[in-house]
Regions:
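N-terminal signal peptide
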Residues: 13-25
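Acidic-aromatic substrate-binding/catalytic surfaces of carbohydrate-active enzymes
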Residues: 24-127, 136, 177, 181-255
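Acidic, contiguous internal or C-terminal segments within carbohydrate-active enzymes
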Residues: 122-176
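Terminal, non-catalytic domain-edge segments
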Residues: 297-325, 333-334, 344, 572, ...
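Extended acidic/polar, glycine-enriched regions
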Residues: 333-365, 371
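Catalytic cores of extracellular degradative/oxidative enzymes
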Residues: 364-674
Length: 861
């Protein structure tokens, strides 16, 4: 279903909303109206009966961070709102926890008069009668912001242990029955920093523009952000809770011991679980503060500091063992004692992790049964870490069918060769291409099949489909559906594989044995042209080819290489196809279409070609869109984590709607952010988010070299998925975007993201420590240097007024004998070139790499 048809359908569905939900109960009490309140920064409404937050808009503005327009279909018991509370308690000495939930069986709360509050209520009517905890909730003005506090008093004659204490959150992330334009205009997205006393939520408009919102602990309370707990609600068609159009809501947990010992007992939590003892008659107050971020998304970190919440800023939170990172702690001077957690993930050196991926995928994941009736041998198959075997059957046939994002783990191995070629791995990839990819996945043509595994037993006599699998779902395609060539996303996987082998063979002659580099380059071109072809009326011949593709930056790399090789006819053909799409996007209000109602995948391609053709307005719109769903926080899992929550359904072993940590959205969306940063080197927010996105997916490579689809974020799991799943496109982003960035950061000073930096007098020396080690950007000069093979061992330049860079290039593990050095100046009007001895070639300068390396100088022209 294409984006524009979907818009029309959703608009029609919206008009039918009242008919769909006519049977829903008004347990919330909307019939009795609202209480309208305001502070210096907010206009807000409370539901009169429940005194939960119904609407929250910046003062004098119309943008509502809450789904007030959907409140009439969110009135049932167990539908959560800001102002609800959940907790578990037990008498000291007891073992069983008693769960309490203010949304479970709603009753009108009792109004409490409080001079220090905008509104206050006793929640006892809506809590179980036998609860020993009396809860008073207050809505208060906190320096113009909105505060929400709960005071719990132990009314029992014995001590009570509070084992969990949670604040459900509700913001307007409901996409159901909205058009793309409405989603952008009305919706917002929530991301957590689970950092204990320094924890906070950031709520950002989907458009990425306008004011944002942060939620922080209230001053003078002990309200740590200990855990982020997904909430279950009843399902109604009107909102479709926990679906592709409505991820669902979460709660901020102050304490989590009760969960840690029960539902979460198999998981390792982000923070040590705690509880709180209330003696008989004792009270405790906890609370949250809702603050407007008037400077928008880029002002979030500054706004957090303004609430007296400690803040940390670092050069990344995924740390290879050979990399030194920086962390700055920004806290109020009068702070007494707080506990903050900064979450790091320590890996082997990035190239070592990449090498393990290549070794594992071409051994343990290598499938050689040539009797396979589907023609899948030899190939690199999807992998299940729980069984330690390739996935040869799955009802989602593409996972076992070497196509779709969930079945193309071979693309990760291929992309690895583009930077770190290995003779044995390339030999197996060439065998795969000649025996499976070209003759079967492509059927010897330029088209690409949706899957080469299928469920149609009559066509494969003698093959035994597993009887333990349910083959009755839509995704168990028959042969005709599997062999369809009508999914454009599948073409990019094939293009990337051909391109990667071209680059490996082009830069290191002798690596390719079965085909020439020219053959691989030609195959990449032909597959690209087939993917984006149109009829005489301009209509797509392959479905979805008009929208942005996952990983299509590789098409841009292909185009550059065609120009460098002098293949002008082929380059012109690719460019014409891309220009048509870019012009279309430039005419659309929301050009980020996909197979889904809302997605975070089209932005990469939309940005690439809008930026390429200098369609600045659309490129800027795209960057804003990405920042709307991609945060930077001091947590390896959430820093640079692009919002995705449905692909465990399509490519995971554990299938559920769940926020995914470092799925392919992270690395692919990092590409536009880092590209834009190179053009605007003073906008370091882009670098912080983008670097988090490109480094995060390194955590998906296990120590044995196997890979996982994404990390499960629900607190009852917190592990990587067993399936390799969609990691192929994810690793493509890692290979295309990894680089070292040297920047004078306003908060950190002169630092290197992805490298080790040292200053000796006026000389700065940087040693790259990223996954590729072939790209470095120096923001003070605005120069971006890329080498085609080998490694950049180190570079040096003057601390002030630098006019040249000296690089030390080495052969690297692939033992490269020569390299092309390409020099770009995206962040400067100054032109740079290689001034040391070199030969002009392929749009750059070729240098010979001796065994000990070679020194190359890049200076202003």
């Amino acid at each position: 279903m294409n984006w524009h048809n979907l818009s029309t359908i959703l608009a029609v569905l919206t008009s039918l909303l009242a008919l769909i939900v006519c049977g829903q109960e008004d347990n919330l009490g909307l019939k009795n109206g609202y209480i309208s309140l305001s502070t210096a920064n907010w206009d807000l409404k409370l539901v009169k009966d429940a005194q939960v937050l119904a609407s929250l808009t910046p003062k004098g503005k119309s943008f509502d961070f809450l789904p007030f327009d959907y409140l009439s279909v969110r009135t049932e018991n167990q539908q959560y709102h800001n102002g609800d509370i959940t907790f578990s308690y037990r008498a000291t000495g007891e073992t069983e926890w008693v769960k309490v939930d203010s949304a479970k069986s709603r009753k009108a709360v009792t109004v409490v008069q409080a001079k220090d509050a905008l509104a206050a209520a006793d929640l006892m009517p809506t809590l179980p009668a036998n609860s020993p905890l009396r809860i008073i909730r207050k809505w208060v003005d906190v320096d113009g912001d909105l505060g929400m506090s709960f005071t719990a008093t132990n009314t029992a004659d014995h001590d009570v242990e509070i084992g969990s204490l949670g604040f459900p959150t509700e913001f307007n992330s409901i996409f159901t029955n909205r058009s793309p334009e409405e989603m952008s205009a009305k919706c917002s997205l929530t991301d957590p920093y689970i950092g204990m006393d320094a924890g906070y939520l950031q709520v950002t408009p989907t458009s990425g523009t306008g004011e944002a919102l942060i939620v922080t602990p209230m001053d003078n309370t002990s309200t740590p952000f200990e855990a982020w707990h997904n909430l279950h609600e009843p399902y109604f068609d009107s909102t479709a809770y926990e679906s592709q159009t409505f991820e669902g809501f979460y709660e901020w947990l102050v304490h989590s011991t009760a969960y840690a010992g029960t539902e979460w007992r198999k998981a390792k939590p982000w923070n040590p679980p705690t509880s709180r003892i209330l003696e008989a008659g004792q009270s405790t107050t906890v609370g949250l503060r809702f603050s407007v971020v008037k400077d928008g998304i880029r002002g979030i970190q500054k706004a957090v500091r303004a609430t007296n919440t400690p803040l940390t800023i670092g050069t990344g939170y995924v740390v290879p063992r050979d990399l030194t990172v920086q962390l700055r702690i920004l806290a109020p001077a009068d702070i007494v004692s707080v506990t903050q957690t900064v979450h790091y993930f320590i890996t082997e050196s990035a190239p070592d992790a990449v090498a393990r991926l290549g070794q594992f995928s071409t051994s343990t994941m290598w499938f050689t049964d040539t009797s396979d009736p589907f023609g899948r041998a030899p190939s690199i198959m999807s992998y299940d870490a729980s069984t330690k075997k390739p996935v040869l059957q799955d009802p989602r046939v593409w996972i076992a069918g070497l196509s779709d994002e969930g079945g193309v783990i071979y693309m990760a191995t291929a992309m690895k060769q583009s930077a770190h070629p290995d003779t044995n791995e390339i030999a197996k990839l060439e065998e795969f291409v000649s025996k499976v990819l070209f003759p079967t996945i492509q059927n010897g043509s330029d088209l690409v099949r949706k899957s080469i595994f299928f469920y149609e037993p009559s066509t494969v006599p003698g093959y035994s489909h597993s009887k333990s699998i349910d083959w009755g779902n839509w995704w168990s395609w028959n042969k005709a559906d599997s062999y369809s060539t009508q999914r454009s996303y599948d073409y990019i996987h094939v293009v990337a594989t051909y391109w990667a082998l071209y680059r490996a063979g082009r830069d290191q002659p002798g690596l390719l044995k079965q085909r020439t580099w020219q053959w691989y380059l030609s195959r990449a071109v032909n597959t690209t042209i087939a993917c984006f072809a149109t009829d005489s009326a301009g209509r797509e011949l392959v479905q979805y080819s008009r929208v942005g593709q996952m990983g299509e930056t590789v098409v841009g790399e292909l185009l550059h290489d065609l120009r460098r090789e002098g293949w002008s006819k082929e380059a012109d053909a690719v460019e014409v196809s891309m220009k048509k799409r870019a012009d279309l996007w430039n005419s659309q209000a929301e050009p980020f279409g996909s197979e889904m109602a809302w997605d975070s995948t089209g932005q990469e391609g939309v940005y690439y070609w809008s930026n390429y053709f200098k369609l600045t307005s659309t490129a800027t719109k795209t960057i804003n869109s990405i920042l709307g769903y991609m945060p930077t926080v001091s947590h390896w899992g959430w820093n640079g984590n692009a919002r995705r929550y449905w692909d465990f359904i399509y490519a995971g072993k554990l299938q559920r709607i769940e926020r995914m940590i470092h799925h392919y959205g992270s690395s692919l969306n990092a590409i536009p952010l880092l590209t834009q940063f190179r053009q605007q080197p003073k906008d370091t927010y882009l670098l912080r988010v983008g670097y988090g996105g490109v480094s995060g997916p390194l955590t998906n490579i296990r120590q044995d070299g196997s890979m996982y689809n994404a990390f499960h974020s629900f607190p009852d799991t917190l592990v990587g998925d067993d399936y390799s799943g969609d990691y192929g496109p994810n690793f493509l982003g890692v290979m295309l975007a990894s680089a070292t960035y040297v920047v004078d950061d306003p908060d950190l000073g002169l630092v290197a993201y992805g490298g080790n930096l040292a200053v000796d007098g006026q000389v700065v020396t940087v040693q790259p420590r990223d996954a590729v080690r072939q790209r470095i950007y120096i923001s003070s000069m605005g120069v971006y240097i890329v080498v085609s093979s080998g490694w950049i061992d180190q570079c040096s330049f003057a601390r002030a007024n630098a006019k040249q860079v000296t690089l030390q290039l080495v052969p690297g593990p692939s033992k490269a004998t020569s390299a092309i050095v390409w020099v770009e100046n995206p962040g400067s009007s100054t032109q740079y070139k290689v001034t040391s001895q070199a030969k002009a070639m392929r749009g750059g300068w070729q240098v010979q790499l001796a065994n000990v390396g070679v020194e190359v100088t890049v200076a202003s022209a």
